[in-house]
Structures are given as C-alpha cells and as structure tokens.
Amino acid sequence: MSIRKCFLWQISCVVSIQLITTVQPLAAQTASESERLQKLERAVELLQKQNAELKAEVNSLKSKETASVPDGKFKTKVTYDGKTYVEKAVVEEKKVPVYVQQAGSEIKLVLGGFIQTNFEDGNVSAFEGRFGQTALKDRFRLRRARIGMTGDFAQNFDFKIEGDFEQNDGTSPSSRVDFSGTDIWLNWHQFPEAQIKLGQYKAPFGLEQLTPDTTLLIIERSNTTGAITPDRQIGVELWGKPFTNIWPEQKDLLTYYGGIFNGNGRNINNNDNNNFMYVGRLELMPFKGKIFGQESFLKLGGDVLNSRDDAGTNISQSGNLLVNSDGSLSSFVLPGADERTAWGVDAWFELGPFDLIGEYLEEYVNGRTVNGVPPGFANFTTDGFQITSGYFLIPKKFQAAVQWQYLNPGQKGNDGIYSITGGLNYYIHGNDLKLMINYIHTWSDFRQANPEFGQDEFNEVIGRVQVMF
C-alpha cells in the first residue's frame, strides 16, 4: 500500500470519529441552535487542523523517499510493450567495489613497479665499448618495465618478488626481450644486527651497482660497473647494522654484508661447478647531520669478491669486458676455467643540493687448468673508476649532473675507454615522474693507437622518461 493511500484512510477514520463524537452530544443536548452551530464550527476547525498536519507529514515522507536515491544514480531503461518502445528512468543499483586480498597471513603487502623509456641517438652505447663490430643503431628503447610485490609477515620475515619485461636472459636472438625475474628473495629480520637474506638479488659489490635504477644521477651506470660487478646472483647472505639497538642514534654508522652465491648469473638454477662466489661489503657512515643548515652525510664503502668459475660462464653480465680485435667490447664467456678476485672502494658525500660520488674497482682474472685442460686465455687485470657529481639548480626540481669514467679491460696493449657525461634531470614529481637527458663523449685508446679500425671518438645523446607506481 502506498503512503498516499495509507494516510487518506487515516484521515477518513479521524473524520468519522470526530463526527460521531460531535453529533452524539448534540443530539442528546437541549441547547440552543447557536450553541450547536458553535460546536460544529469548532469541530470543523479541529478537523481542518488535523488534516493539514497529516498532509504535511505525507509530504515529508515523500521527500525522504526521493532523497534516498542519490543524484546521478538513475539510468535509462528501454522497454517494449508490443507496440512501441518506451524509455524510463530507473534507479541504478550500486556496484560492489572489486578488491584483492592476499591469500597468506601477510601483515603488509605492496604492489608497485616502474617504467623507463629511452631515446638513444648517435653512437649508441659507445661508452660501453659498443662500436665497430658491436655498434648499435639509433633507437627508442624500453629500458626497464618492472612490476613487483613486497610484503611483511608478523614472524619477522619480509620478501620481494619482481620481474622485468625487458630482459633478454636466454632469449633468441639476443636482441629479443622477454619477462624474467630480477629480485626474488626472503629476508629474516628479527635481529637488525644479523639478518639473513636468501634468494636472487644483487650481490653486495659496487656502490653504483647497488644504487637503485630509479635514483641514479646519470641515465646509465658506468662502463666499469658493468664490466666488473657481479650484478644479480642466487645465494644467501648475512647482513646487518650492529649499532641499531646499542646506539640507536648512530644505527647507520656501520653496515656489513657477507654472502655466498652460485656466481654464474641471474635466473640460472644450476651452478657451473661445486665452487661458490664469496662476496663481502662494509659501509661506514662517519657523519650524518647538518652542515651550514643543510642535510648532509658522508658514506664510505669497500668490497671484496672471489669466485672459481668453469668454462662457459659469463663473467661480465652487462656484456662489456672482452676486447674484440677492433677494440670494441662484448660479453666475456670463459673458454676455460678461471679464478677471479675483485675489490673496490667508494665514497659518497652529500651537502644539501650537492652530491659527489667516487668509486674505484679492480678485478684479477686468472686461468685454471682443470683435469689437464688449459684455460684457453691469458691472465688479465681489469680496473676502472667513475666520479659523479650532481647539483640542484632548483631545489628538488632541476638538477645538473656530470660523470667522468674510465675502464681499462687489460687484455690488449692500450685498450682503455674514457667517457665524460653531462646531464640534466627534471623531477616533475620526485623520482616517481622524472625526465633525464645525457650527452656522452667517448674516447678509445685502442682505436687511437690503431687508426686502421676507424674513428676513435664517439658521441651519443640519451633521453629518458621514468614513471614509478
């Protein structure tokens, strides 16, 4: 029954009762005609008043009923009665929001990722030794496209699983990219002084290598970092900050890392032999505070690495260690067994808008005879450095950066490669949305000493758009 019908019925009942209660006394009384008329007038006035109150209540209920449907929640529905099509507005049902819930018992779960797109023009990647027989063409490049998830458990475990759509691990041809894992690890952190990390991640060697891709001041890492550092490996490490609880104000004073890894690269579950790669790193932050009212710090670091590898192992993950006949560089896949030892030192000083970063790396690659089989290559020593500086011309928005780098592969006489890079970074929304542009000039000592192979100086421009989510 509608509201209108319900209240009309109530009004009729009230009128009837009022008439009965009014007429009966009038019939029984012997009062004058004027008294009877006065009583009737009062009864009519009372009925009119009650009728007005009931109408007001009906109107109030109607307005509430209409207001219960939110604005903009109507949709047009077309019906057919057999003769014509009729359009009418009907209330649109509210949709239940869609959400994702973890299947496990994680107390924290975060989904994120980032995309880096490059435009590369000129002598593309010449600073990495890609010229001559390994030269690349001008290109647009999806440099990285990663998606990952991190989480925490109440039982003092945290984890990360991340993959990249732009890697070429095992793809054919090698220029083809595919999706593969980057960081896949589990970390036990009950004691900040002694945490255990297990899985695939960057072995703790090299400051520039360990700096996140999204926070680098220069678009690409230096040639030295690519040639010597082991990048991502599968293994386990013990790491921590010894002063976290005993000296909380100086918890970052010292950080240590010590790990054991397969040593033959990422996304490879089989070890190349029964030996492992041993990696260690120490970081010291003797100062963290303010200088001239500016947030500042000084961080010092040192690394060491040792690995015994078998034939077929790629000891240069970035593909820029083996010196070709024309002085260009490519991946160094061992023709025989080796033992390699590397070390490095680094420093990072920040004073407000100014950063100064320096790093030196050195690696000894010595052949091993296994089961009477010679290594098939001569021993060599590779070394190099990078010095990087940045300054915010507009605080937190517009930054100028410069880098000087050098790599001595050490396999042919006078085979060093130098590069100087100048760049500008525009932080539209911090590192979440950033534009970068670099100009790189490169010299090849080998090409200069052997002009028959062609040019010995190279130029490149790289632009990048970065989005994090």
PLM regions and their residue ranges:
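N-terminal periplasmic/intermembrane-space "pro-region" immediately following the signal or transit peptide
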Residues: 26-116, 123-128, 248-251, 469
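Acidic-residue sensor for enzyme active/binding pockets
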Residues: 33, 41, 53, 57, ...
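C-terminal segment of classical bacterial N-terminal signal peptides
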Residues: 17-26
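A general secondary-structure boundary signal
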Residues: 37-41, 47-61, 65, 114-116, ...
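Outer membrane beta-barrel
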Residues: 96-306, 380-410, 415-420, 444
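Bacterial N-terminal signal peptides that target proteins for export
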Residues: 2-13
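Low-complexity, intrinsically disordered short segments enriched for Gly/Pro and polybasic residues
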Residues: 10, 24-25, 74, 78, ...
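Outer-membrane beta-barrel pore domains
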Residues: 134, 172-174, 185-189, 200, ...
